[in-house]
Amino acid sequence: MTNKDNTVEDLEQFIAPPAAENLNLEARNLDFYYGTHQTLFNVSLPVERNKITALIGPSGCGKSTLLRILNRIYALYPQQYAVGRVLLDGKDILTDHDTLTRLKERGDNVTLDPLGDDISQIRARIGMVFQKPTPFPMSIYDNVAYGVRLHFNKSRQELDHIVERSLHRAALWDEVKDKLKESGLSLSGGQQQRLCVARGLAVEPEVLLLDEPASALDPVSTARLEETLMELKKDLSIVIVTHNLQQAARISDYTGFMYLGNMIEFCSTDRLFARPKTRRARDYLTGRFG
């Protein structure tokens, strides 16, 4: 960005991360570019194991962009690139050969981890659920089994078990167990979103990313989804982007507040909502801007 007010040096920040030994995903010093236009500035994000981390901030602040870096979805678009590091259990999943070159140009002293070139494995280990439900035009069963068939060689009996278990974990099994052959598109919006969660869970990810998953859902469906996420964090780490401050306060353990492509404040959710340290976080949480 060209306006100097948008740079890290001009923004008051407060970062209180969890203990390093408890992290299973960590973004470090990320910059992100759409062509020559920079949209993220030296952003770091620690994700603690078996916790829910929320990202909040005004529209366009970089929340969804950060989420898409974490499992390399941006790599589908050649004009987009990230510079920095993303560590999954200590292994760098961001630094492929192209990124390594950019890091060295920036002056970072890093080596190449082979995992960075295996995007398929990365996306199996870090699942993603989008804002709008995206069921595939196939049966409920095949929706859940799709990723498993793509990544693993499983028997039909094993697939049956995985599909049932994933639907149970997504709190959807009781609603669909008698119509697994019906189209996933026949489900309600809330059910479709939980189907997408089940599809992501089927490949046994370590981390689940969710980009405003309840924005199009009614209050009842939102409550069901939140209950599901609270149960799921027993088995994996969750990062959720939300514009709903009450939702972040209800379900997250840690919250990061972003503004103009910067991580302004990061700490425990209770601490951020009760005693925000930065002026911009206080103003956002009290509704002075959005």
Swiss-Prot record:
Molecular functions (GO terms): ATP binding; ATP hydrolysis activity; ATPase-coupled phosphate ion transmembrane transporter activity
Reaction(s) catalysed (UniProt annotation): phosphate(out) + ATP + H2O = ADP + 2 phosphate(in) + H(+)
Alphabetized PROSITE patterns for the sequence: ABC_TRANSPORTER_1 (PS00211), ABC_TRANSPORTER_2 (PS50893), PSTB (PS51238)
Secretion signal, residue range per the UniProt entry: none
Top-rank taxon: Bacteria
Compartments, as annotated in UniProt: Cell inner membrane
Family: Belongs to the ABC transporter superfamily. Phosphate importer (TC 3.A.1.7) family.
Subunit text: The complex is composed of two ATP-binding proteins (PstB), two transmembrane proteins (PstC and PstA) and a solute-binding protein (PstS).
Protein name: Phosphate import ATP-binding protein PstB
Native source organism of the sequence: Zymomonas mobilis subsp. mobilis (strain ATCC 31821 / ZM4 / CP4)
